[in-house]
Amino acid sequence: MSAISSVFSSDKSVFIPYISLGDPDYESCISWADALIRGGAGILELGIPFSDPVADGPVIQKAFKRALAYPFSMKKILEITAEIHKLHPETPLVYLTYFNPLYSMGLEAFTESAKNSGIQGLIIPDLPFDTSEAEEFFSQLERKKIDFIHLVTPATTIDRIQSMKSFASGFIYYVTSYGVTGERRALAVGLKERIQMVRNKVGLPVCAGFGISTADQAKEISTYANGVIIGSAVQKIIEESGSNREVCISKLFTYASEIRASMK
């Protein structure tokens, strides 16, 4: 059983927050991660900055822009990841990254370095699972015992969901709405049934993300999803308070605690 799989061994839904590494600087991200994990995160997503984040909304796009205002360093990304892992070795860390930064480094070198830094899962929004590149990469990840986490959207066909079973591990990231990341006022109609269907077809835990921001939304989704993923709302706190580290730490801890307390 992988470290990620073990998190889902209880009946309680898992809180999975996301932060963009490098915003406003690399060192602060260690504090952000620590606050979120102490507040109740069961898994932590770490975003690798990229100049063309096609799946991300304005909040995360701005976070990447702030991070990339400084020279981008994959070496620094890996070092900060290792520091977070050292603080909380019990909490699985997952990279959410576009394919280009990995390809630029070299897939084998990246996989080895990510594993050594404490990464237990990867989400790559712009790498379809049914490509030769994905199949080759999946084999590398399997050897390193890193989970390859795939996205399912409202538009993904049932046939494609079934095909995903052979190339996915850890959990499925279910995108709750069309469009890019960002906060939404209401949840999609039929979300519960769709998540249950995906879980039955793939045989993995299903975590819901995109558009979730409030404790009430997290409470509702946690009754039928194995995990609740929140990115833009977390990153918004960092955008507004990141210049004052202690204030931001307090706000992130409070927010995480409220979300975790609301979940079933």
UniProtKB/Swiss-Prot annotation:
EC top class named in words: lyase
Keyword tags: Amino-acid biosynthesis, Aromatic amino acid biosynthesis, Lyase, Tryptophan biosynthesis
TM helices/strands, residue ranges: none
Disulfide pairings: none
PROSITE patterns listed in its UniProt record: TRP_SYNTHASE_ALPHA
GO cellular component, one term: cytosol
Catalysed reaction, written as an equation: (1S,2R)-1-C-(indol-3-yl)glycerol 3-phosphate + L-serine = D-glyceraldehyde 3-phosphate + L-tryptophan + H2O
Domain of life: Bacteria
Role: The alpha subunit is responsible for the aldol cleavage of indoleglycerol phosphate to indole and glyceraldehyde 3-phosphate.
Record text on subunit structure and interactions: Tetramer of two alpha and two beta chains.
Family (UniProt): Belongs to the TrpA family.
Name this polypeptide is given: Tryptophan synthase alpha chain
